[in-house]
Amino acid sequence: MHSRAKGILEKFQALFSLRSEESRPRWFWVRRSLYGLLVCSLFPFTYLVLLSDETTFLRQGTFCDSTNRITTPVHLRDRLSLDSTVPFATDLSHIVFGISSSAETWDRERPYNELWWRPGEMHGYVWLDEEPPADSTWPSTSPPYRVSTFNASTIGGSSSAAQIARTVVESYKAVMAEPGSREIRWFVIGDDGTVLFPENVVAMLNKYDHEEMYYIGSISESVEQTVRHSYSIAYGGAGFVVSQSVAAELALMMDGCLERYANLYGSDERVQSCISELGVILTIEPGFHQVDLQDDIYGLLAAHPVAPLLSLNHLRHLKPISPHWETQVEAVKSLVEVSQHDPSRTLQQAICYEHRPGVNWSVSVSWGYSVEVYPQHVSSKELAKPLMTFRTWRTRSPGPFTFDVRPVDPNRACELPLIFFLDQAKSETGRNGIIRTITEYSRNMTDSVISSCKLQSYIKALELETVTVYATKMNPDDWKRVTSL
């Protein structure tokens, strides 16, 4: 390995276990007769270069070879040497979370909120439209609640949309009245069903100067939604962030602004319209996910953008993200828990190939979630596109979407991957102090479509039962280097 890249690029190792008379798993480079594979780690910035080049994968990308080396293009190594260290790093103590909800919906949605909320470690509020029922006890596992003091009925249009739009102002005014308010840098706003990944939110915010005026979020996944509403708004279910200076300015002008935009449909458009009057435009972070999708979002999670996973929304309306769990809350809890082992690497995609007599495999790892094995060659450009396992949010149409997709045709089973979902994860620290993670994935045995393929390459691959992936814990500061590419 080139010395200049050695501190940045690590190796993924994947151990493939077989269903056979001799059940003991082995590595392919120990015995050629076994169907094993060494998968190399493609760091996010390496993957960016891999996808942006029109040349072939093996010439310009980072790849595995028979000597277990990682080869890195010279132009990438030069970029990786950049020093992006920023002093006075942001941490959770600098963030206030504002959760928009209602007395009617909170009990239904709070299981998702409580997957990520940490009492005593985080600062924020759930904003309700009225006091919760008198005979109920507010759970200690939830953020503390406040009742909005804003009389939204005095403003035309939807009063609930106006109230939700004002969550950032309510949060700002509440925290400014408390000791230590000078330490607050950012306000993170979401819905009651939004699942956030706090460590990744912190890592993302450390790319930005908190003293500047920022409005950070992401757009919808469905074109029909963005055309109907806007390409320049941060969708609130995905969550969005404003810097303290933006929140302060909104506190001075929000009420009058909401009156000016009372004709707009929802809270997201109203927030964006008011922020635009400050001369601040949306900074897009693709790790925020509104999830304006229906059915099964497997494809989106298995080919995540090259960005930290920041949020997921609309989960209650979707199929469980893993077939290993009966309910969506259980499935999402599994993802949240594995993310705590290596937040920055969660859902990051690694791609590798194994070509030798009798084996022609393409492998895609979505760390902490799934492994796909294709018993054929599939280009990295195609593997980077999510499988279209979902439909649009409003009309359940097969697109268009605001990102590239690969169609899924059940009648062409031999083109589909074998999919292994996360079973368990653990971390261990070596003698040198380096932390690595071990994640194990097992195949979805109920996938009858895959079993219908009669090609010999698929029949051999169907012997695989589990995949174990080893990876060094990713440094969250590496995300700063992605922006320099």
Label each residue range with its predicted role:
Residues 2-3, 32-50, 69-70, 263, ...:
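C-terminal catalytic/acceptor-binding lobe
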Residues 2-74:
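N-terminal signal-anchor transmembrane helix specifying type II single-pass membrane topology
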Residues 85, 89-92, 112-123:
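Short, acidic, metal-binding catalytic loop of nucleotide-sugar glycosyltransferases
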Residues 107, 184, 191-205:
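Acidic donor-binding/catalytic loop of UDP-sugar-dependent glycosyltransferases
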Residues 126-185, 199:
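Active-site-proximal specificity loops/subdomain of glycosyltransferases
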Residues 186, 227-241:
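A recurrent flexible, glycine/aromatic-enriched loop bordering the glycosyltransferase active site
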Residues 196-227:
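Conserved donor-nucleotide/metal-binding helix-loop-beta segment in metal-dependent transferases, i.e.
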Residues 197-198, 235-254:
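Conserved nucleotide-sugar donor-binding
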